[in-house]
Amino acid sequence: MDCIKSIGRSAFVAIAPESPFIAAGTMAGAVDLSFSSSANLEIFELDFQSNDRELKLVGQCQSSERFNRLAWGSYGSGSDGLIAGGLVDGNIGLWNPISSESGEIAHVRDLSKHKGPVRGLEFNVKSPNQLASGADDGTVCIWDLANPSKPSHYLKGTGSYMQSEISSLSWNKGFQHVLASTSHNGTTVIWDVNNEKIITDLKTTVRCSVLQWDPDHFNQILVASDEDSSPNVKLLDIRYLQSPVRTFVGHQRGVIAMEWCPSDSLYLLTCGKDNRTICWNTKTGKIVAELPTGQNWNFDVHWYPKMPGVISASSVDGKIGIYNLEGCSSYGTENQQHFLFHLLDADPLTAPKWWKRPAGASFGFGGKLISFNKNLPEASEVFLHSLATEKSLVNRISKFEAALENGEKTSLRGLCEKKTEEAESEEEKETWGLLKIMLEEDGNAKTKLRSHLGFSLPSEENDQTANEPHATCSSTNVEETQKVPEPEGEEEESSDPTFDDAIQRSLIVGDYKEAVAQCFSANKMADALVIAHVGGTELWESTRDKYIRMSNAPYMKVVSAMMNNDLMTYLHTRQPKSWKETLALICTFAEGDEWISLCDALASNLMAAGFTLAATLCYICAGNVDKTVDIWSMSLEKQSAGKSYAECVQDLMEKTLVLALTTCNKRVSASLRKLFESYAEILASQGLIATAMKFLKLLESGDFSPELSILRDRISLYAEPEAANTSASTNTQPKISNPYQEKSFTPAPLSNAQPSRSITFFPLNPPRELKNADQYQQPTMDYHSFNRSAGPAYNAPPGPGSYRSIHSQVGPYINSKIPQTVAPPVRPMTPTHQVAVQPEPVAPPPTVQTADTSNVPAHQKPIVASLTRLFKETFEPLRGYSRDTPAKKREAEDNCSRKLGALFSKLNNGDISKNAAEKLTQLCQALDKRDFGAALKIQGLMTSTEWDECSSWLPTLKKMIVTGRQNVR
């Protein structure tokens, strides 16, 4: 490709070490079209944002002589350092690059000592105040720019070390007192500047034009010749100068200039009289890229240190070109292969250092951040940081988890009360207030709910009034001052004698039905009801119903609904705005499952009418977690104003779990599953991996969506992997009885209807004591509580102190102190277990020989047969050859027998999931084919996917497979 920027000059170049400027000094011996003999030093700005191809001139000045070499160092009073030029007359000119706003380059002074053109010139990078110069008189001068009146060191070879014209010199990159110089007579000398002594030298028969120290290996140096007969570049070790380390072959004529890449020592730039400018891979000696071939050769090349991959090349035909090396071809203009593709083809594992990140960071799962910095002493050192971006949220989660672990309703009521006080909206205040009521003591929830809705019993109001002295006094005064006058005498009610006679005749003959009809005709409702009562049940009921139908009083509709036990019909006739009155009525009269259905129906009506808050509260009363979470989830985005998404999810999760304490729901809706997924992600992102795993364990594996399964696996893999090994080893120990592991207590309902749904949330710690045991039913299923400090990782088998999955539980997330939702009175069941009764002897666990397999499905029978055969093949050969003691052999055999016996019992009872049974069938088929490798792979797959269900016998099965394979061999 063509150059990206250019300058129309035939000049030597020096690039500023820190600033985007390039200096150009007129080349000695160059002739332009104007045949001018002037000498100029100019500074151009390297502005790659500009669309102009020509660089902008920002400063210039005239020089007394033309230049043979130009260098730009960082030493100087200004931030741009100093420019040094090796002149034809033997002087060294010093310039201040930018001395004023006018852009004039200020000439500082000349350094005079040499008696011939100065061709070698370089600042010491490690000691910026030192400038080395070499001239045609064969001398090398070291100038201290702090005191430049004379050279601080004067180096000149004698005898066999005599050098002719100095063509190039270079400071060692590792030792600031070591300098190398080369000359046209082929002599290269390594100097100890401090002692002005020669360390070593190299004599060749060819002219040496340029040399460069290896920036990485301080004992290696590059030397090139400008003779056409020897156009090679040699890398020499100063300890073994007669044998080059590497030779770079590519130029057809002599090499004039070269420079090592300051950004990556893997690359070297050379130019020669064959019109080629080549970039080399110094590790392999191969050509990496090449500049487009011009009409004439380049005599000066440099790397731009501030932008790796950008180079400058000065040509004899009067042009300074700025090139992007990455756009150059690999083998010249004839083969336009891109620089990048050549790199990948030549060394696919190596990239330029400027493409590599000097530092980097990456966020990891579990609130982790990993970072690296290539400038550190240890290149392979990385840092792992734990980040909690929501510190206030982490504190909230910890407090909420502590409230759940406590398991006491007082702490949960305190949480609800605190949330009610902190609520920023009326909706939140109403929600938390209702949740607090649902956690009240037995018998109080019903009364509290009605009071919360604004309806109290008269006795409650009288009791409250009696406690107020001023109210008592006022009521007494009213009784004294407002006296009802006594009637002077009874006045007979006027009536039509005709109706009276007709009614009387009907009664005389016993025609009660006609008498009632006559009373209705005369609008004597009370008389009709009295006569109907005498006339029998059928007449009484028909008369009563007719009276109710004729009545216009609103309260009579309530009476009708109660008499007909048809609250559902009455509910659908109610106005949505009167939902509190309707809910209070249901709370008073509904019983059993009717409470749930009525609350659900009322909530549905309210939701359809747009009363979202009222519908939510009714769903809460019904214990309908799914519907409640659906509504809360829909309003999640609306509530996010002023709060982060994580805080909104935390609010929603807190309400959901508190609601779950008083309900039972075996179903997991999509909204609830999504809520758990979002909450687990938030917990994991804040580094709360163990807490996230606890909540995910509340869900049965069948309830996991693909996304949730992936999240669970990531969390389980991130958790302590050694927990699986620890738990697997403990499976061989005898099982110890644990009351909280073996029994689950379902509390009796409160004084109102008990929801029929079941939820799957449980207290974080086992209840310390079960009070009022007579209110609890007989334990039904396993109860696994949660222990923060001892909870195993996901891939460990469940045990004491861990959550139990939702579908394996009946009891809600409660202990003896947590009430259920509002419910009508139900007679508590007497527990079948008594403390004083001696427990029955525990039956021995099933073994391979004793397990009942009569009910194992036909397609699973081969599993029993294959594993029984594997058991026999595993232990029978060991009885005569094992080094273990007989007791240990018997213990191992019995343990494996018990594990398989437990598996056979699960198969017999149908307690194995479909996925586990299918994998187990595949495993046994592999065993039947003697393909133990495939069997082990299936066992490993089950370990990662079915561990919760199969952890008790999977390790034993693996041992048997491994032993069986060894026996076959």
Curated annotation (Swiss-Prot):
It comes from the Eukaryota. Residues 464-478, 724-757 have a biased composition (Polar residues). Gene3D superfamilies: 1.25.40.1030, Functional domain of the splicing factor Prp18, YVTN repeat-like/Quinoprotein amine dehydrogenase. WD repeats lie at residues 5-45, 62-105, 113-153, 161-201, 203-246, 250-290, 293-333, 510-550, 601-642. It is found in: Golgi apparatus; Endoplasmic reticulum. Residues 457-499, 722-757 are annotated as: Disordered. Residues 487-499 have a biased composition (Acidic residues). Pfam families: TPR_Sec16, WD40. Required for protein transport from the endoplasmic reticulum to the Golgi apparatus. This is Protein transport protein SEC31 homolog A. It comes from Arabidopsis thaliana.
